[in-house]
Amino acid sequence: NPSLTIEQFGTTGFGILDIKAIIHPVTIVEDYVNDKNDDKEITDKTRVIDDTAFNSVIKNEDNSEYKALSNYFINQTITDKNDYTGMFKDKNLIVIMMESANDIFINPEYYPNFYKLYTEGWSWENNYSPRNSCATMNNEFSGMTSLYSIYNTCTASKYKANTYYESIFNLFNRQNYVTFSSHDYTEAYYPRSTIHKNMGSGEYYGVQKLGIKYSNEYINWANDDEFMEAVLKIIDKKTSNNEHFMTWLTTVSSHQPYSSSSIQGDKYY
C-alpha cells in the first residue's frame, strides 16, 4: 500500500532510491527460456450461452454507442471450454500468491526452485499487475474473480460486501470441493475474512487463527515456512476422508521494507 508506506516511512527513502537508480541504473537480463510447445487438441469453442436477455437489451437500447458495445460483446466467443479443459479433473489445487515478488526470482543460480517451476511448468505472460494503491489486495481480487480492479481504490475493501458467484472458490464449491483461504498476517490493511467468505471460501485463516508468531511492526513479518507447515496441518484435518480441496494462500515474508533487517531476510542475505 504506497499511501501507507509514505505515511510510515516518509518520502526521503524513496527519493534516495530514485536518485540511486538514475546514477547507477540496473540492467535486468532475462536469462530464462520458456519455449514449451505442447501439442494440444483443438477445443470446440462454440458460444455456449443463452443470449435472450442480451438480445432484449440490444433491441431496447437507444444509445448508439451502448448498442455498438453490446453488439460487439454478443458476437464474442463465450465457452466453458478451452485447450486445458478436463486436464486436471478431480485434482486438488493450491494457489500460492507471493506478496511483493517479481520475475527477479526466475534465476537458476539464486532461486533454482522458482526457475525450475517456471521453465518446466506452465507460465503465462499475458498477465498485468496493477501498480496502484492496494496493489496486493487488488491483485488478489483479480486472481480470485478474473475481474479487473479499480485503479483508484482498494476494490476488495470497497466491495467486500458483494457476493461473487463466479469466484474461484465457488467454482470449486460447485464441484463439492473443500475450500479455504489463508494469509499469515492480520487484517490491519485488508478485510480478507469478510470478502473471502463472500467469495465462497469455506473458511479463512488469518495469522492469529494459524497460531504462528508475527509482529505488528514492519520489522519482522510472519515466517512463511511456519505458514506452510500450519496450512499442511489444516489440509490434513479438512481432508481426513480424502476429500478434494482447493485453497488460496497469500504469503507475507518478502514484504517491504526491503532495506530493513528481518528474521527471514537475514537468513539469505
Per-range role (PLM):
Residues 62-269:
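Solvent-exposed soluble domains appended to multi-pass membrane proteins
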